[in-house]
UniProtKB/Swiss-Prot annotation:
Protein's name in the database: 14-3-3-like protein GF14 phi
Compositionally biased intervals (Basic and acidic residues): 250-267
Organism phylogeny: Eukaryota, Viridiplantae, Streptophyta, Embryophyta, Tracheophyta
Subcellular location: Nucleus; Cytoplasm
Segments for region (Disordered): 244-267
GO cellular component: cytoplasm; nucleus
Modification sites for N-acetylalanine: A2
Gene: GRF4
Length: 267
């Protein structure tokens, strides 16, 4: 990676540092650098490169903790089934620590989205990008929150995804990677959080079918990204329809919890 020019602005310097942090897999610092970029642009929009760097930074920071939470929750269930109450108490305390970290990360990006990124977005793809991101981080909260907090997080997720979907359907082609990525994550939300496999499958299938119908219009630039997400949509559809065939409608309706999050494909 070449050194930044000596005359580079603070904004360019932080972008460069974020790229260095990404290469070094120091994602917490990458988040800090990209937050500084967002502060430096004031009311202007981030460039496509900058918003992608911000997304990658937060996705890695949150992704590590989501994976940790799933592992600890799985261990907790096993210890509960064995009646190891002392271990369960220790595990719950540890899970609570991870949940505090998850909450802090989500609160940080959601505040940035609400105060800067969403209000500054001027075109269709950036609006959908940020509203999808807003939905994603509310969804991550809904994964581990309980009671009213979970209900609130789910409602915020639905509101953000629907707002993004309205703009995407009006302004982005069915093959646009951002529109496809929204459909992918929105369908995962229906399946995992709202426990609605029918709606999840309908949304994923519609997005896939609409994109297939216009596949020949795809430019070389976005072909790889779009077809990758289409494959993920198809993977989820295969998994979900298989699950639904294994259960009667009554069992699906009354199911207390969805399949583990790691089985679903999202971006």
């Amino acid at each position: 990676m070449a050194a930044p020019p000596a005359s580079s602005s603070a904004r360019e310097e932080f972008v460069y540092l974020a790229k260095l942090a990404e290469q070094a897999e120091r994602y917490e610092e990458m988040v800090e650098f990209m937050e500084k970029v967002a502060e430096a642009v004031d009311k202007d929009e981030l460039t496509v490169e900058e918003r992608n760097l911000l997304s990658v930074a937060y996705k890695n920071v949150i992704g590590a903790r989501r994976a940790s939470w799933r592992i600890i929750s799985s261990i907790e269930q096993k210890e509960e089934s064995r009646g190891n109450d002392d271990h369960v108490t220790t595990i719950r305390d540890y899970r609570s620590k991870i949940e505090s970290e998850l909450s802090k990360i989500c609160d940080g990006i959601l505040k940035l989205l609400d105060t800067r990124l969403v209000p500054a977005s001027a075109n269709g793809d950036s609006k959908v990008f940020y509203l999808k991101m807003k939905g994603d981080y509310h969804r991550y909260l809904a994964e581990f929150k309980t009671g009213q907090e979970r209900k609130d997080a789910a409602e915020h997720t639905l509101t953000a995804y629907k707002a993004a979907q309205d703009i995407a359907n009006a302004e982005l082609a069915p093959t646009h990677p951002i529109r496809l990525g929204l459909a992918l994550n929105f369908s995962v939300f229906y399946y995992e959080i709202l426990n609605s496999p029918d709606r999840a499958c309908n949304l994923a299938k519609q997005a896939f079918d609409e994109a297939i119908a216009e596949l020949d219009t795809l430019g070389e630039e976005s072909y790889k990204d779009s077809t990758l997400i289409m494959q993920l949509l198809r993977d989820n559809l295969t998994l979900w329809t298989s699950d639904m065939q294994d259960e009667s409608p009554e069992e699906i309706k009354e199911a207390a919890a969805p399949k583990p999050a790691e089985e679903q494909k999202e971006i």
